[in-house]
């Protein structure tokens, strides 16, 4: 196992319901990557954008070589094939680790999944299949999965995929909520990269924001 190397996989919703938040998503993602370029240790970044289909924007790229996300990269459209995006990414990363030399397998692997709506377009993966895949990687290899959801019950939805309650959070799907998401995600990634145990408090700021501002509506 390669010490101080973290595999980070972002699965980002770009379905039509994200319309109006393109610049907030782009800005938040770029700010997070900039912070991670200056963090301790090494990191490989994979970014999967999904709507009806999945697009691999980055495939295990050194974080220091990641170029800023642009509006040409992130254009919203289509429906929400969330399960296919998650299942495909786990299959890809899992196969790479399986056939790599043991000393080349990253010390940590972390998936960050964000969506603002319910699954409605996957063709290849089911809830049960994705749940089996996630639980296997968590138990066998200690992979981390974070799930951030808007306009759904994020905790309940995550549980269908085998993601624990303390790794799921509801967020406000607006400019402020999106910016906060990426701030908190960056903090969580930094903790994992430094081998600091990720407790349930990682999501406290998002929880508080959701409860405070959600009650106004």
Residue ranges and their predicted role:
Residues 1-217:
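Acidic, low-complexity intrinsically disordered regions
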